[in-house]
Amino acid sequence: MALSVNDCARLTGQSVPTMEHFLPLRNIWNRVRDFPRASTTAAGITWMSRYIYGYHRLMLEDLAPGAPATLRWPLYRQPPPHFLVGYQYLVRTCNDYVFDSRAYSRLRYTELSQPGHQTVNWSVMANCTYTINTGAYHRFVDMDDFQSTLTQVQQAILAERVVADLALLQPMRGFGVTRMGGRGRHLRPNSAAAVAIDARDAGQEEGEEEVPVERLMQDYYKDLRRCQNEAWGMADRLRIQQAGPKDMVLLSTIRRLKTAYFNYIISSTSARNNPDRHPLPPATVLSLPCDCDWLDAFLERFSDPVDADSLRSLGGGVPTQQLLRCIVSAVSLPHGSPPPTHNRDMTGGVFQLRPRENGRAVTETMRRRRGEMIERFVDRLPVRRRRRRVPPPPPPPEEEEEGEALMEEEIEEEEAPVAFEREVRDTVAELIRLLEEELTVSARNSQFFNFAVDFYEAMERLEALGDINESTLRRWVMYFFVAEHTATTLNYLFQRLRNYAVFARHVELNLAQVVMRARDAEGGVVYSRVWNEGGLNAFSQLMARISNDLAATVERAGRGDLQEEEIEQFMAEIAYQDNSGDVQEILRQAAVNDTEIDSVELSFRFKLTGPVVFTQRRQIQEINRRVVAFASNLRAQHQLLPARGADVPLPPLPAGPEPPLPPGARPRHRF
């Protein structure tokens, strides 16, 4: 794919005038003789990159003509003969995140030669790591006298987690700047970029860097001892912090709808279980189908933020098993299904159902008006819609309505409560789907934030088996915390490396890998897990696998080593794949006592391949030819090459044929 000057400037960190001076060229098929042989082959560029130019560092500098990084050997006031398009953007992406360490290895070059086409690509493996402190779990929930308060501890954890999942979020706003100590000095001290940072930060304390609020928040959330129960909901808070004004309205509305639905089904469940204990005042009962635009009244009645104290107080009214089903049903919207109900009596419910309205059943009336009502609701939001509203289909003829009413009567009388609750959820789900379609591309990333459903379903299964204990709760909390961090980081990498169209158009994601190492208080590795995925959707596929894997492993907590007959079933539960690391490490993870784990190290590795562009500027080609000839002669005489930036006069071009190829280089192709 052709590379424009603007694309090259964006992905190399250089200015547009610099790239216009450089004159980038991707396909050198009919231009090979304009360059020295070492500059056109993969082996030759590898030699130049490693021993002459040091491309792995040089690409991070300001390489404008006459810039400080270009003054002496080997550039002589000109840009280099090549640019690795996307490499500087990759390094900048990793530096802009809260990783503790970053490494870039295996910088290699490959060439593709065929009639009419000769190009060179670069590839690199990035490895970015940070550690989260999980050893402070005992401070998260009071574990004193745990066995006698098991139910209270479980309900406290659930309440805090549900409040985080359904809280009505607003982004943090403030004035001035946020500063983070000990960050931001990832560039070489003498580089032009570092000099610019130092000039900007004059008067600022040593080692501090001005950072966005969301980056400061995430650095804070890395330590469970420090953030305590604020860790719950970290991923969603960071997501809405980065959203634009339109996305903020849509995401907040989606969260309100989930909250309202959760409060609705909890109220209905509690009322069914205790019809005389929770009478509802008449003013709060909605009359259907007269309230045909019932969504606004529904939100007004039920979208109050979920309160942890009120959830804990539900212990007598709503069994934990039913509470978990309600949580899963609400959090999984717009997917999933309504919670199963065993009582079809709607007495004490939150809606006043009128069996017939003009000869038609309530649920059927709601279903027929659903699309038009949803469109009106979205149109009333203070956002500009991305899609033109399709007008609703005309109502069916009256003859059909009369005939259908007779057929519906018996079914509706039999299934009214169940069908009605299903219709409420279907309406909310369809509205959420429509709102998600209105999100901008950068905010439409729910595939990274659905992990909560896996963990709630795991606790639901444990509750059904009567297997809730300290070990399962400890692992549930710890892995939920790990999943929050994993989701946030993978979403960040997805947004910067796959969802940024300019980068994704030219740079290919070959492999993505997440390595999770649990360490004890002395730093020893307790177990290590590896997940690999390839292809364009590698980041989202990794999140789905990790979420399912960690949630399934929660159910094995406290059971010790797996028996032979259990291993195959466990591997099926975590959807084991051959590229998921050593099986013994997986079994060790399932059997370990989580009290031994003090911290979890998360490593995110990904391999990228991008294009190399060549210069068409004769002056740069000439300097490169003279530099390569001089370096080749020094190497032939077994002498050391000058250090980059050394004050070496530009050598003259020797007379005669070109110097011999460096080791490993191949002769020029002729077709």
UniProtKB/Swiss-Prot annotation:
Annotated family: Belongs to the adenoviridae terminal protein family.
Result, substituting residue 580 to T: Complete loss of initiation and elongation
Disulfide bonds: none
Segments of skewed composition (Pro residues): 649-665
Description of post-translational modifications: Preterminal protein is used to replicate viral genome, upon genomic encapsidation it is processed first into iTP and finally into TP by adenovirus protease.
Gene: PTP
Region (Disordered): 386-409, 645-671
UniProt name for this protein: Preterminal protein
Main localisation: host cell
Assigned keywords, A-Z: Covalent protein-DNA linkage, DNA replication, DNA-binding, Host nucleus, Phosphoprotein, Viral DNA replication
